[in-house]
């Protein structure tokens, strides 16, 4: 019996970082949706993903903080990792108060940490080991 693939939503406007994050996810799941704006993400949010990776600065009218506030209003309980280059203390403090599980500075050097965090969060929330070494085709 095949394990259910974790559903991960990535909200990131930078195409380079979209690709880099997808590379970190390739051995974890194939069930990934990428959104470039907070508006598109919220408009297409029809089910509860197992994990959301969210940037702060996004194209469009709303930023990652606004997306997170809207998720809380809608009572979504999906774990959220903030992966952003915005490290202002006021932003970080506000986001942590809204319940993100991790805030990771967005650089190419922190991508391994992002992958480790994703694996740990999925194992914790899904109650099963997440296989990061091979695909189940």
Which stretches of residues belong to each language-model region?
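Short, conserved "switch-loop" micro-motifs in signal-transduction and mechanochemical regulators
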Residues: 86-87
């Amino acid at each position: 019996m095949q394990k259910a693939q974790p559903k991960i939503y990535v909200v990131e406007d930078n195409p380079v970082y979209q690709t880099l994050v997808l590379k970190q996810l390739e051995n974890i799941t194939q069930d990934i949706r990428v959104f470039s704006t907070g508006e598109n993400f919220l408009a297409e949010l029809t089910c509860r993903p197992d994990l959301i990776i969210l940037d702060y600065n996004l194209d469009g009218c709303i930023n990652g903080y606004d997306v997170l506030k809207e998720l809380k209003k809608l009572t979504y309980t999906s774990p959220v990792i903030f992966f952003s280059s915005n490290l202002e203390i006021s932003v970080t403090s506000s986001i942590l108060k809204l319940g993100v599980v991790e805030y990771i500075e967005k650089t190419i050097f922190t991508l391994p940490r992002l992958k480790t965090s994703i694996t740990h969060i999925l194992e914790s929330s899904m109650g099963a080991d997440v296989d990061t070494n091979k695909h189940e085709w």
